[in-house]
Amino acid sequence: MPGPWVAMIMLPQPKESFGGKPIGWLFWNTCKGPRRDCPHCCCPICSWHCQLCFLQKNLGINYGSGPRRRGTRGKGRRIRRTASGGDQRREADSQRSFTNMDQ
């Protein structure tokens, strides 16, 4: 299993801020193994716990799966009728077809 590691991210800054020197962020990963036991707290110490915590808690970036979306209506599902307007329309259509057959 992989042990703790340290990652440093260097970000360039404009010349006006901090004397034009790049800012480095240091991440300590104390999570051991593929399963991460990160704290659920969002305090400043826990949000800088590892790179994953920083992205999710500080920046709000979550690459995990979102909520499941429902699919579109399939052919087998019933469509609900509204009131009795549809029935009246069917009766009128059936009466028209009978009058056309008589002629």
From Swiss-Prot:
Span list, region Disordered: 63-103
Residue span of motif Nuclear localization signal and RNA-binding (TAR): 68-81
Annotated region (Cysteine-rich), positions in chain: 38-53
Listed Basic residues bias regions: 67-81
Gene Ontology CC: one annotated term: host cell nucleolus
Gene Ontology terms describing biological process: positive regulation of viral transcription
MF (Gene Ontology): RNA binding; RNA-binding transcription regulator activity
Family: Belongs to the lentiviruses Tat family.
Additional free-text comment from the UniProt record: The sequence shown is that of isolate R29-127.
Function: Nuclear transcriptional activator of viral gene expression, that is essential for viral transcription from the LTR promoter and replication. Acts as a sequence-specific molecular adapter, directing components of the cellular transcription machinery to the viral RNA to promote processive transcription elongation by the RNA polymerase II (RNA pol II) complex, thereby increasing the level of full-length transcripts. Tat binds to a hairpin structure at the 5'-end of all nascent viral mRNAs referred to as the transactivation responsive RNA element (TAR RNA) in a CCNT1-independent mode.
Subunit structure: Binds to bovine CCNT1/cyclin-T1. Also binds human, equine and mouse CCNT1.
Identification of the protein by name: Protein Tat
Lineage, uppermost ranks: Viruses, Riboviria, Pararnavirae, Artverviricota, Revtraviricetes
